[in-house]
Amino acid sequence: YVTGNSKYAINKANVTANGDGGDDFSGWGSAVMADQNTDVTINDSYINTAGTIRTAIWVGDSSKTTVNNSVIYAQETNDDYSTYSELVPSMMKRVPFALGMEGTIRATNVLGAGQAIYNNSMIISTGWGALSTDSGTSYNNTGTYALQVNNSVSGIGTVEVAQAAKKYTATQTVNGVTYGYTMGGSGYVTYADSGVWNKYSNVRFYSPDYVQILASGESSSIYDDSYMYSDRIAFMTQQAGGGTLTLKDSDIDTKDALMQIKSGKANKGYSHLVVDNTDVDFSGDSKRTDDGILVELVESDDA
């Protein structure tokens, strides 16, 4: 836990945190938590958490956490009913069911005016979200990206040290070790709410559900020179929250739709989609009748 107006470095660490967390809106139970106005750098490390809402990287207030050449892996555990029921955080302990996903752990959660920066890393959650924001502060007020991800692999599923004869969804060499990622479970790769802006450069994102959800008319996400894969819908705006999505010099494989815009009385935002020199491929077998749709307007199930 790093707090105050401090600067801290974590180098070549192997961090394991097992057991349920306490509250991923407050950072309780996180493997690395930074708040107030701290500057944390994590280099050449492996951080592994296992448990309900056992966040790996939590960034809040006006703090910044930079992760270089590291693996961040957050795993769900199968709590029995009584154990799960006794866990009572201030907000959520699983992804909202109305989003049509399952999962109980976010690998990264950025709140307030916090910043999480990833370089040449692998960020994986078995279910819910890998790179999440929640209750953020608008870019109009901060002038900084909540999430900035470069040269990294992120997704929903599992990760292990790569075995020579085994096929993986993606691999990434981190700190001299090649890791294999296998897509599975349920959830989204990344999220933008409350007017935050995110930027992704030369990333590879994989999800069985959504690559990204935007939940604010002022939110923005920019992808360049990247590859994104979704088994369902690549991008979704929640409750007609709107926002601006820019896809530049990238490739996307999806099955149902490129972008799904949900109606909703709670937010009256406008969605902006910019596709610039980007290939969109609707290959694969869709699980529904209607597929191959660039922009889909639907009634919200999360009004």
Can you say where each PLM-predicted feature lies in the sequence?
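Parallel beta-helix/beta-solenoid
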Residues: 6, 38-46, 67-71, 120
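Acidic/polar low-complexity surface segments
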Residues: 7-36, 61, 72-111, 127-191, ...
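N-terminal extracellular ligand-recognition/capping segment immediately after the signal peptide
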Residues: 13-18, 45-47, 52-53
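Periodic glycine anchor positions in long extracellular repeat architectures
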Residues: 37-38, 51, 114, 226, ...
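Internal alpha-helical scaffold/solenoid segments in large eukaryotic proteins
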Residues: 49-55, 126-128, 208, 218-221, ...
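Hydrophobic or amphipathic alpha-helical targeting/insertion segments
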Residues: 57-58, 62-68
